[in-house]
A protein has these predicted regions:
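Structural/interface elements that position substrates and couple domains in central-metabolism enzymes
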Residues: 1-281
Length: 281
């Protein structure tokens, strides 16, 4: 609120606009971040901005699917694409899908609004379909790796919230993975720096789900490590300890945190997003 990138006022009344400008003046002393427009345009601006960011994410996730099938590395592609000043690096990180209280809701709301005026928004429909598929991707990779022999397998799950620095699990990719795994008879040993209370509330009556006091504890006797949220604590782990505690040195990385070549040298099987099957041969 106090450090907004921009302040958009939707009003059709000049007096109201003046009052709002005065209200926000302490937070906009240079008078360069406040934009006034009609109410309908302001409402649409909010939804359009979130839908556009969601579109960028889904576009890169679709490119990651193509990169994986062509044995290319989406992370190198991301750097190349983001270096174009017309595009930039914001919101082009491939991964296991977006979640939260804004992007999924706003994309669907904008699509529904379009239909009320007899317009079918094909791009918006594709954005959330790509995201839904991306959320299922980690479980698909796990299922393929174990040839559908999943019952009794234990997942060490790092990350529960839909993004770092929040305990919000609304529409989180972790929930899609957890539901699929528990339904298949697997067990989840989870760790998240702040979202475990929320996870325990959601899964308090679910057999097979447990939270652990630190990332290392979640690894004990697990068949694999799965990373869903890119918390800083996960970026530089003790790979030797991971290897010791897992039954098998295999990592499914939904956020592309690690260098595939380095993990291969350490003896891991590493399955990330859009990084090409050649890394595991």
């Amino acid at each position: 609120f106090m450090r907004s990138d921009r302040i958009i006022i939707g009003t059709d009344n000049a007096e109201t606009e003046s009052h709002l400008r005065n209200l926000y003046r302490p937070f906009n002393r240079n008078n360069d971040r406040l934009i006034a427009m009609d109410i309908r345009s302001a409402e649409l601006t909010k939804y359009a901005a979130n839908a556009f960011l969601a579109t960028k994410i889904s576009f890169m996730n679709e490119m990651s699917q193509l990169a994986e099938r062509l044995n290319a590395d989406i992370e190198q592609i991301r750097i190349g694409v983001g270096s174009d000043p017309r595009i930039g690096y914001h919101f082009i990180n491939p991964g296991c899908g977006y979640g939260g209280s804004c992007f999924p809701k706003d994309v669907l709301a904008l699509e529904a609004t379009a239909k009320t005026v007899h317009y079918t928004p094909q791009l918006l429909n594709a954005v959330h379909k790509v995201n839904d598929e991306q959320k299922r991707l980690l479980f698909t990779k796990i299922r393929q790796y174990f040839n559908d022999h999943l019952k009794g397998k234990i997942i060490a799950l790092w990350g529960l919230s839909f993004k770092p620095n929040t305990d919000d699990m609304r529409e989180a990719p972790s929930q899609v993975l957890i539901e699929s795994a528990l339904t298949a008879g697997m067990k989840i040993q989870a760790y998240d720096p702040v979202a475990m209370s929320e996870a325990n509330r959601i899964y308090q009556n679910r057999v097979g789900f447990s939270c652990h006091e630190n990332p290392e504890a979640a690894l004990i006797n697990a068949d694999m490590l799965v990373i869903v949220t890119e918390w800083n604590i996960f970026f530089n782990p003790d790979f030797n300890l991971i290897k010791q505690r897992l039954k098998e040195p295999v990592i499914f990385d939904g956020r592309n945190l690690y260098d595939p070549s380095h993990l291969k040298q350490l003896g891991f099987k590493y399955y990330a997003i859009g990084r090409g099957e050649t890394f595991n041969q």
